[in-house]
Amino acid sequence: MGACVIVTNTNISSGLESNTTGITAFSMPTWQLALWATAYLALVLVAVTGNATVTWIILAHQRMRTVTNYFIVNLALADLCMAAFNAAFNFVYASHNIWYFGRAFCYFQNLFPITAMFVSIYSMTAIAIDRYMAIVHPFQPRLSAPSTKAVIGGIWLVALALAFPQCFYSTITEDEGATKCVVAWPEDSRDKSLLLYHLVVIVLIYLLPLTVMFVAYSIIGLTLWRRAVPRHQAHGANLRHLQAKKKFVKTMVLVVVTFAICWLPYHLYFILGSFQEDIYCHKFIQQVYLALFWLAMSSTMYNPIIYCCLNRRFRSGFRLAFRCCPWVTPTEEDKLELTHTPSFSLRVNRCHTKEILFMAGDTVPSEATNGQAGGPQDRESVELSSLPGCRAGPSILAKASS
């Protein structure tokens, strides 16, 4: 392996995977360290502030509390935790190659941030499945609030189980007077255990979820873009509802693609290191790792920006959240976006059935009346005149109850 590496299972604090080949304690110029510190500090501030604001927007406003939005809250909390605990502490460890934070936090660092990473990707998968059921199978029963909370709890339990092996084998070692937080895999099968764990993790928290989301959003896209709105409703609620669903799909696809791009180089880095350990002898590898780790962690700060750019309600929520800033001036319309319950249209037919063209309380980040659609009550509206023996009657406008 060469004298350039530490022959221990040094975890240079990936927060997800361990570099068990070890890394030399390369020093860097002060100016370079300052640049990296600024980049990581900006990442943490944007990610924590943005995801905390997203959580507040949804939980503080009754209109926003929908099934899909609960998964968005779960995603935001996971990203917030990953940025706060993973990015900040691991940057210090990776840049100094010394563990300053004690044994207990070593165990914590190899459990909770990794769990948050798993929760993040599984929350995106849950959103994709929820939208698939709402749009492709609109008449199937939707998740209730208790069921949604149970699914979220299950996501955290599965994530904890997947993160536990790295926590279980974590320990503190001393190397030439420097304290290390390492993952000490069983010595008799160290290389095999490491590679197997890397591959299992990549499959379970990257390839498999991305495949599920790709299939789900592909079917959703085909369903929505093939759906035609009847000519007499071309300017009505049905059209707005359909456009809102399309916008939601575009938003979530952008979220997923951003996540995939940010994490792919990081996973490839560790796979390559499992086969070619000598790459860790190169002087530039510390800079490569810091760059790839920053790119991976930056995935935690993009979602709030995407929501704010593509969704009217989130823009209103951000204006309200930052109204103390002199350059932010929320309007009365911003308050109504988050508190006012819109009207919806009912179409009554001879069969005494109702067609709900637009329902209040639809989810974000899809948009309908003023840009929103797709919540727990979100069902595909049905053209009643197409049902046997039924003919649509006059449209009746009714106010939705809050």
Swiss-Prot record:
Family to which this protein belongs: Belongs to the G-protein coupled receptor 1 family.
Cellular component, GO annotation: plasma membrane; sperm head; sperm midpiece
Lipid-linked residues (S-palmitoyl cysteine): C324
Disulfide bonds: C106-C181
Its job: This is a receptor for the tachykinin neuropeptide substance K (neurokinin A). It is associated with G proteins that activate a phosphatidylinositol-calcium second messenger system.
Record's protein name: Substance-K receptor
Cited SMART domains: 7TM_GPCR_Srsx
Stretches of the chain found on the membrane's Extracellular side: 1-32, 91-107, 171-196, 273-290
PROSITE patterns the record matches: G_PROTEIN_RECEP_F1_1, G_PROTEIN_RECEP_F1_2
Superkingdom: Eukaryota
Transmembrane segment boundaries: 33-56, 70-90, 108-129, 150-170, 197-218, 252-272, 291-310
Record-linked PANTHER family: G-PROTEIN COUPLED RECEPTOR TKR-1-RELATED (PTHR46925), SUBSTANCE-K RECEPTOR (PTHR46925:SF3)
Transmembrane recorded as keyword: yes
Entry's localization field: Cell membrane
Region entry Disordered, spans: 365-402
Species of the source: Cavia porcellus
